[in-house]
Amino acid sequence: MPYNPIPQISLWAAAITSVGPMIAFAAIMILLRKKPRASAVVSLAAVTASLVCAVFLLIRHWGMEMPMQATVHWMVSGDMVIPLGILLDPLSLLMLVVVGVICFLVQVYSLGYMAGDPGFSRYYGFMSLFAWAMTALVLSPMLLQLYIFWELVGLASYLLIGFWYEKFSATQAGKKAFIMTRTGDLAFFLGILLLLAAGGTINILELNNIVLPGGLNSLLGALAALLIFGGIIGKSAQFPLLTWLPDAMEGP
């Protein structure tokens, strides 16, 4: 599938949507652990900037004729190059706004919900980690990059479910969620490896060029799709990997 380069202003906006929460997470966990008010301000500022940039990108590029992509080389080994990048298409633009709105509303609500909790700063640090992982996942043009942030989403979920770690039930709930979702994630990773072996690439747009015209073996394609769907089942608590969800209520 052909694509256009990302204009500079849009590239900066896309970077801010993801990098802002990442910086907030690092700042809170390293510098602001004992400053709850500052932690909330930094986290909310980052997620607000992320939402504003997401809305800007949606308005600016909605109705685009071709997706836009920018990549850089991350790891090079012989003839194998593993890039990182940003992909903007109608689906990712819409999901960026959805993620931004939900993260913003949750963090605003949490100002009152978590008020007075000894782990207030830590909570906002974990929420910033969650926002970073989600936005970076949505922007990923490579399946390996997507998988890395998929796992970071799982880590953030584990940290939030087991947030009140003084309670044995909370730590057990966190472990249960982590282990059960890893089962699905293993299937997801195997699906990615199968697509790489069958198609020779982990670039989503390049895979579209191979799959849509029927250039991928139908059996391998179906198996890869089922494996990737297994990861989705685990993360979204669908049958049979759903018993961790009620226990997740142990977290905030």
Regions found by a protein language model. Give the residues of each.
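...captures the hydrophobic TM-helix bundle architecture rather than a specific catalytic motif
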Residues: 1-252
